[in-house]
Amino acid sequence: MMRKFLIGFLLACIVLPADLLFAAVGCDLNDPDRDVARLFPGSTGYKTNYVAIDQKGGPALLTQVEERLGDKFQGLFETIDVPYTLYEVFKGKDKIGYIHGVNQKGQYGGIQVFVVLDLDGVIKNFYFQKLTSRYGKELRDQKFGEQFIGLTLKDFYNYDVLTGKTSGPSGVERIKNPVPEAEFDFRAALRGTKKNLILVDEFILGNKYLQYQKTVGEQKK
């Protein structure tokens, strides 16, 4: 009896850390050196920052992020302790931009949505690092990603991640789904992008775009 108890206890000690390990799923560049050089031609270096909502502001910050997103965080990809990886990119001593990615639930599996931003939070590039989808070819097409260029969080505040609709002027309206059957993954990409931009605004830009959330709220009244 005692032997069974000891075996059970040891197994619990082994399994528990594994559960904790997989409870928070981060999103890193597959090859930072190569990817940063490709996304920022002429850059000379980068700094990697790891930030989590529970460390930065805890439950209060999570609530604020969810309000800005217009949806609740859920699943392994959106726990309060997810370690977000933010890349600050430099040319010499000058900072020239940021790269940040998030995990997002797709129809057939996880999606990794990355945005490349200038210092003002304007999207300079968009791409999927991981995309498990029957329509991956169409969604990975360069023309699809180009539709995000020039947009900011201000545009995405007018996009409702729950309904998939925009209200008021928004550059998100110009982003077209290349395949009607890919609607789930298309909307997942937009939700992931909005979440991405909100986290960068919270962690790096000092809530520069928070003022526009209030404007959108007033428009809906």
Each language-model region and where it sits:
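Positively charged n-region of N-terminal signal peptides that target proteins for export
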Residues: 1-5
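Sec-dependent N-terminal signal peptides
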Residues: 6-12
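Intrinsically disordered terminal and processing segments
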Residues: 8, 17-112, 119-221
